[in-house]
Amino acid sequence: MSQTLQALADGLPADAFAVLGPKLLADGRRQVRVLAPGAEAMGLIDPRGKLLARMQASAIDGVFEGTLAVDGPYRLRIVWPDRVQEVEDPYAFAATLDESLLLQIAAGDGQALRRALGAQHLHCGDVPGVRFALWAPHAQRVAVVGDFNGWDVRRHPMRQRIGGFWELFLPRVDAGARYKYAVTAADGRVLLKADPVARQTELPPATASVVPSAATFAWTDAAWMANRDPAAVPGPLSIYEVHAASWRRDGHNQPLDWPTLAEQLIPYVQQLGFTHIELLPITEHPFGGSWGYQPLGLYAPTARHGSPDGFAQFVDACHRAGIGVILDWVSAHFPDDAHGLAQFDGAALYEHADPREGMHRDWNTLIYNYGRPEVTAYLLGSALEWIEHYHLDGLRVDAVASMLYRDYGRAEGEWVPNAHGGRENLEAVAFLRQLNRDIATQFPGVLTIAEESTAWPGVTAAISDGGLGFTHKWNMGWMHDTLGYMQRDPAERAHHHSQLTFGLVYAFDERFVLPLSHDEVVHGTGGLLGQMPGDDWRRFANLRAYLALMWAHPGDKLLFMGAEFGQWADWNHDQSLDWHLLDGARHRGMQQLVGDLNAALRRTPALYRGTHRAEGFDWSVADDARNSVLAFVRHDPDGGAPLLAVSNLTPQPHHDYHVGVPRAGLWREILNTDSAHYGGSNLGNSGRLATEPVGMHGHAQRLRLTLPPLATIYLQAEK
């Protein structure tokens, strides 16, 4: 026993519960031992504060011993040099983690992990406290350290459970207390690690975890949540992609907190008519320059914007305003910061040991080991935490292509084939299917959007049909082709017309989102406006035409912040958008156009009901490369009015341009990007146009149109 006590006093591996706390003596009394290095004196008291026994310092430094003659609960009265502390003895409590939960985690159950691990408020009997729990199977010893014990690694060694799990209930730990785990590796190194399942963190660059509030947030979005019905007719989906730390900043160039973002961002998004906000990763991340894409706290909103409750308030306010919230979520890799997941218990745990499997050379990050059920439980639990705890409406899963292929970014000989000799990461495939299965089963109606840049088949196909089960996939091919086309001088566009039309070859193979994202406005490219050719007038006209073409094209929409008013410069994550540009009429016109595009999308079923179905689209003009004109019809599968979109992507206007349409009668121009309202030359088709009974472009009727320069127009059939 003395050896065990000495080991504990030295901070070495030993079974604390074997020697600390109350032990029954042969005569019926209880002997109590407490490890409290630095304490000057100690006593045992009853719950009302009455002294039951004085404790004596033993020969082992920091160990106190005392005997209780009576049965019943006791507390410790510890005299420290600067204060007196009265608290229950953590080593008087039995284990609180249900073994069945631990077995479920070991089988890959994310919900079980959410319930078991991290800093969880609970009562043992009538004693409030926090249970700390983690997974560290290679560790010899784990202790919890924090504000409540002076960060002394000797004070609170944890109880080891089956499967490499550790737990300790600490009475009366307050919300807001900072903590970490002191993990003793097999080789004796002591590693100070943040809690992988922390629900709150310190503000970076500080790295401690924080005990969250015990209070339950009072949501007011019941109506929104009840209406999130996957069986309902699909509505429009138009996403405003936001980096919360740089959308707008305060007077000291600091990120806005969640209440301020709610006050400013939500009305702005409402005004522009977007249906959803997609947040670049707000999971806690040590390096702001990663934009959140190198996270370590997959269960905690970053402290850069305030508390977790502040984020819940933001989501609640979005829902009250009729706006959904999507989180950019990173399950592909993690950074190797010393306080994080890398070598968490002194060995490769969350990552692969072999760098050919475990390291992303492109990003100098580590790859999750999707073959370990506890690791997939950790990732699944994170996804479910954001959806259930924060009422999120979707996850955009980052870098899916890097997960699917073992040779992603690797030369021959730098990767390990799968069990069948192939390049596919079969464990990652299984994980992604489980992710989508869990979300669809437990939270029907929640979106899962894959950023997948290859031609992997069936990303949005049903799992039962061999697919991955995502609800949507980013259409990176469409973005690269069309943006590349628009960056060309109009004089060259005739030779590259297929860049506009090729996307329709595969437009209905997946449920696509058309993304003009943050990736298109960084690394010296300038903003979308700055990437357009020509003088200022032509740049604005090109971008207006491009955005209207995008909004009419099959697929849901995503636009990164700043593009809606024509930011010239690269996006800078360390400063606000250039809001002063809205002093200029053309920038205001661009912003008004985006609002009008979203309004047209919302009120025109032909633009969204058939957006993922081939019967929702017909070409009228696909091959007029010489004039850089294309025209197509969008159909409402439920029989609503069709819409004709026509783009003229040269500065040359066309008069009396004939386009075939599917319905006889009157057609009305409902949007024209060359309108003077948007800063254009105001050429167009005022009023209503009557069809002529002349067959053209596979349709029985035709229209005679005026096509303004560098513009897109929408015309809708009238009843």
From Swiss-Prot:
Domain of life: Bacteria
Keyword tags: Carbohydrate metabolism, Glycogen biosynthesis, Glycogen metabolism, Glycosyltransferase, Transferase
Catalytic residues, chain numbering: D398, E451
CDD domains membership: AmyAc_Glg_BE, E_set_GBE_prok_N
Pathway: Glycan biosynthesis; glycogen biosynthesis
EC annotation from Swiss-Prot or TrEMBL: 2.4.1.18
Reactions performed catalytically: Transfers a segment of a (1->4)-alpha-D-glucan chain to a primary hydroxy group in a similar glucan chain
A Gene Ontology cellular-component term: cytosol
GO biological process, one term: glycogen biosynthetic process
Entry GO MF terms: 1,4-alpha-glucan branching enzyme activity; cation binding; hydrolase activity, hydrolyzing O-glycosyl compounds
Matching SUPFAM superfamilies: (Trans)glycosidases, E set domains, Glycosyl hydrolase domain
InterPro entries: A-amylase/branching_C, Branching_enzy, GlgB, GlgB_N, GlgB_N_E_set_prok, Glyco_hydro_13_cat_dom, Glyco_hydro_13_N, Glyco_hydro_b
Function: Catalyzes the formation of the alpha-1,6-glucosidic linkages in glycogen by scission of a 1,4-alpha-linked oligosaccharide from growing alpha-1,4-glucan chains and the subsequent attachment of the oligosaccharide to the alpha-1,6 position.
Family as reported in the entry's similarity comment: Belongs to the glycosyl hydrolase 13 family. GlgB subfamily.
PANTHER family per record: 1,4-ALPHA-GLUCAN-BRANCHING ENZYME
Subunit-level organization: Monomer.
Protein name: 1,4-alpha-glucan branching enzyme GlgB 2
UniProt organism field: Xanthomonas axonopodis pv. citri (strain 306)
Taxon lineage: Bacteria, Pseudomonadati, Pseudomonadota, Gammaproteobacteria, Lysobacterales
Encoding gene per record: glgB2
